[in-house]
Amino acid sequence: MDNNRYDALKIENQLCFPLYACSREIIKRYTPFLDAIDLTYTQYIAMMILWEKKSVTVKEMGRCLYLDSGTLTPLLKKLEAKGFLTRVRSTQDERNLIVTVTEAGEQLRERAVSIQIGRASCRERV
C-alpha cells in the first residue's frame, strides 16, 4: 500500500490544526483576565457585540460570532441571569428574539477594559 497517499491526512500537513491550536492558546491566555469579570471567552465576545450595537437579534449575533442558536441560547440565558442583558420577543416579528445590553452590562464594559490592558502582556509572551 502507498503510504504517501495518506500524507495529506497527517496532522502536521493540515492548515486547520495550527489554527485550532492557536485559537485554544488565545482563549487560554484570556481566561485569567476573563475569570476576574466572571465571563467565559464566548460570553465575552457576545458582550462585545452588545457593547458595540446595544441591541441585536439572536440571529444577527449568531452571524457575527459564527455560532448557532443551540450554542447562543444557553450562553445568553446565563448572561441574562447575571443581569448583563435582556431577551425580549420582537413586537414586529415574534420569531425574532431581541437581545439588549442592560445598565449592569454597560458597567461590565468598564471592568472589561482591563482585559485589553492585560491582553498586551499576552502578546508579549507569544
Report each predicted region and the residues it spans:
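Residues within helix-turn-helix
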Residues: 58-59, 70, 77, 97
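Short, locally clustered residues in the helix-turn-helix/winged-helix DNA-binding domain
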Residues: 20, 48-52, 113
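Pre-recognition alpha-helix immediately N-terminal to the DNA-recognition helix
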Residues: 18, 29, 45-48, 107
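Key DNA-contact positions within bacterial/archaeal DNA-binding proteins
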Residues: 42-44, 70
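N-terminal leader segment of winged-helix/HTH proteins
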Residues: 1-37
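Short capping segments at the starts of secondary-structure elements
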Residues: 53-57
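The alpha-helix within a helix-turn-helix
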Residues: 62
